[in-house]
């Protein structure tokens, strides 16, 4: 089962060393972790071979990420959280894009391994030109992501199950 301790915000420094959220997670001991970040848009001629994430087509959900170098790992999301996000998107008529990328790493890669494991999922919005002075996103994707997350979080109650079937 799931124990509900309430929801809260934890702010951290991802770009520092990709382990910024681990300190907070050790203290909070979460059952669920949702990483919110950009998702690399692949809707330009030079990026279309790297995926199917487009600006203006809704928020994104990562179904697989892996850094691909050394001991850096990635995330395969918990099935209950995938279902929750899909159901929430359907409920609000939000287009939900799916992503699977190599070369991507977030703090969630480490948080998911704490204790007996933390149910995890990476959510985000498509962005072009990451880490440049010309980052581009579609404001409607951000608004839809906000609505999606509000809806999903409101459905994480004491009855929400993290048991894998």
Annotated model-derived regions:
Residues 18-22, 44-49, 109-110, 133-134:
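Short, well-ordered secondary-structure micro-motifs
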Residues 12-17, 38-40, 127-129:
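Acidic, glycine-rich active-site loops and adjacent beta-strand->loop/helix elements
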Residues 12-19, 101-105:
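Active-site glycine- and acidic-residue-rich loops that bind
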Residues 23-27, 46-61:
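Short, surface-exposed, charged loop/turn segments at secondary-structure junctions
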Residues 60-146, 152-165:
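Active-site-adjacent substrate-binding region
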Residues 1-7, 11:
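Single conserved hydrophobic/aromatic residue that forms the stacking wall/gate
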Residues 4, 25-28, 53-54, 113-116:
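Solvent-exposed alpha-helices and their adjacent loops that cap or buttress functional pockets
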Residues 25-45:
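A glycine-rich helix N-cap at a beta->alpha junction
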């Amino acid at each position: 089962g799931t124990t509900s301790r309430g929801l809260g915000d934890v702010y951290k420094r991802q770009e520092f060393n990709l382990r910024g959220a681990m300190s907070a997670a050790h203290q909070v001991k979460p059952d669920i972790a949702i990483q919110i970040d950009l998702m690399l848009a692949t809707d330009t001629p030079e990026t279309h071979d790297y995926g199917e994430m487009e600006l203006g087509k809704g928020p994104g959900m990562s179904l697989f990420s892996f850094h691909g170098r050394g001991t850096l790992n990635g995330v395969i999301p918990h099935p209950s959280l995938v279902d929750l996000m899909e159901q929430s998107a359907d409920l609000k008529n939000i287009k939900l894009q799916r992503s699977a990328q190599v070369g991507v790493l977030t703090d969630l890669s480490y948080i998911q391994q704490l204790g007996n494991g933390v149910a995890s999922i990476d959510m985000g919005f498509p962005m072009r030109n990451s880490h440049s002075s010309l980052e581009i996103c579609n404001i409607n994707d951000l608004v839809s992501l906000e609505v999606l997350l509000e809806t999903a979080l409101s459905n994480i109650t004491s009855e929400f199950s993290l048991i894998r079937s």
